[in-house]
Amino acid sequence: MATPQQPLLTKTHKQNSIISFKILTFVVTLFVALFLVVFLVAPYQFEIKHSNLCKTAQDSQLCLSYVSDLISNEIVTSDSDGLSILKKFLVYSVHQMNNAIPVVRKIKNQINDIREQGALTDCLELLDLSVDLVCDSIAAIDKRSRSEHANAQSWLSGVLTNHVTCLDELDSFTKAMINGTNLDELISRAKVALAMLASVTTPNDEVLRPGLGKMPSWVSSRDRKLMESSGKDIGANAVVAKDGTGKYRTLAEAVAAAPDKSKTRYVIYVKRGTYKENVEVSSRKMNLMIIGDGMYATIITGSLNVVDGSTTFHSATLAAVGKGFILQDICIQNTAGPAKHQAVALRVGADKSVINRCRIDAYQDTLYAHSQRQFYRDSYVTGTIDFIFGNAAVVFQKCQLVARKPGKYQQNMVTAQGRTDPNQATGTSIQFCDIIASPDLKPVVKEFPTYLGRPWKKYSRTVVMESYLGGLIDPSGWAEWHGDFALKTLYYGEFMNNGPGAGTSKRVKWPGYHVITDPAEAMSFTVAKLIQGGSWLRSTDVAYVDGLYD
């Protein structure tokens, strides 16, 4: 029997070593298990947690990798909610764009080709615009309302359009030079931002108010009164007249003198006459209205074109990107002619813009509805190839869209819509309009086929509804861009049209083409839905329909 000072069981040195080894083995095994949990299971749990944030992304793995980068750089944590991640992602995107600007400027300073310098100038302008749009979107997201969601979606759609436009302009550059601008990365980030936005907020489901006799609600009551007035009676802030009876002799001078970032409407009245100039309403010139003496009396004319060295973007006779832009009772034309190819008369990238009772004349690429929300009413647009193109969210009502006689071997395309991502809130809607032939086309209409449109980009979206289609429209209705490009991903629709060109029995059989029979589907392309008209155009006496005719 052991004494009180001795253990009941004595252990040898060898036994103690075995026990220590087992404990060490257990600790190592536990550490390895924890390692596997952290480095194998945790990423899986992270992916599960944030998969909803990236569920609408075209490349969900890329989207998740961007989120992972934010966490790795301690910009957000793995517990951050989707809204916080989106805002930080947008802040970092601004940083990326600001880094790209000096790179583009440096490339521009290293080349001598005028056309390429022009393209890079366009890119610099578009990058500056995009920085502002992303910053505005961050502020809108913070407000967490449905109307602000619609604003952010429109602005971020514009950012993606800006980047794609820049890339299109650089098509003649070497791949190495394009890679240096980081444009592919910016485009990817813009697409992911739209996908994140779609997952963290609820789209605006606007309530429609029946009736006619109103302008979309984003026109204020003061703007309504202005739009009811003639130019000479409007009480303009500035008057332009060629004969010296106004303060300015050119529209460009008057626009330059207008206040920057005005919170109230600033009106420029342009007296009758023909003004040969190119005019740009920059992003700083907000809430600007330009009004003339009528679409046949006040004419702004230019002739810049691609053949002579301009970029398509910069060829516009009048370009407007300042928010809240209104153009009324005026003609904008580009007289370059069909032999000069792309030659824009009017380019609009101004959010919540209104073009009312205007004439827009050119041939190829007449009206560049570039981006943001736009409304056209009682206007007259002429052209040949792709004469309404771009990636705005735009509605035309009570307009005449007039196909002209094109050049030899050419065909007329009324639209060429440029949506590049399904999360973009963009598309072209033609409602209560007449699509007809010009006097010079009528005698030879059978020699030059005219189509409602063709897909400029992969997710092109255009709807023609409740409109008159003249006999100039080819029975197939729509044309290919190149082979089967975009035929499965586009959305082209027709709803309740009339006229000799409105029959759909011989229309194209593409997967993306729709003869719309459900009014609820057509409603998505109305003023209230496509451009959220109920939230930014107040009631006016100018005829307007927010939904469909009964």
Swiss-Prot record:
Chain positions carrying an annotated carbohydrate: N179
Major subcellular site: secreted
Binding site for substrate: T312, Q342, R454, W456
Localization annotation: Secreted, Cell wall
Other remarks on this protein: The PMEI region may act as an autoinhibitory domain and prevent untimely PME activity during transport.
GO molecular function, one term: pectinesterase inhibitor activity
Disulfide bridges in this chain: C331-C358, C399-C433
Active site per database record: D365, D386
Enzyme class: hydrolase
Originating species: Solanum lycopersicum (Tomato)
Gene3D superfamilies, alphabetized: Invertase/pectin methylesterase inhibitor family protein (1.20.140.40), Single-stranded right-handed beta-helix, Pectin lyase-like (2.160.20.10)
KW Cell cycle (keyword) present: no
Record-stated family: In the N-terminal section; belongs to the PMEI family.
Superkingdom classification of source: Eukaryota
PANTHER family for the chain: PECTINESTERASE
Enzyme Commission number: 3.1.1.11
GO biological process: cell wall modification; fruit ripening; pectin catabolic process
Pathway: Glycan metabolism; pectin degradation; 2-dehydro-3-deoxy-D-gluconate from pectin: step 1/5
Record has Glycoprotein as a keyword: yes
Chemical reaction(s) catalysed: [(1->4)-alpha-D-galacturonosyl methyl ester](n) + n H2O = [(1->4)-alpha-D-galacturonosyl](n) + n methanol + n H(+)
Official protein name in the record: Pectinesterase 2.1
The protein's role, per its UniProt record: Pectinesterase may play a role in cell wall metabolism during fruit growth and development prior to ripening and may be required for preparing cell walls for softening by polygalacturonase during fruit ripening.
Site (Transition state stabilizer) location in chain: Q364
Keywords, ordered alphabetically: Aspartyl esterase, Cell wall, Cell wall biogenesis/degradation, Disulfide bond, Fruit ripening, Glycoprotein, Hydrolase, Secreted, Signal, Zymogen
Pfam families: Pectinesterase (PF01095), PMEI (PF04043)
GO cellular component: extracellular region
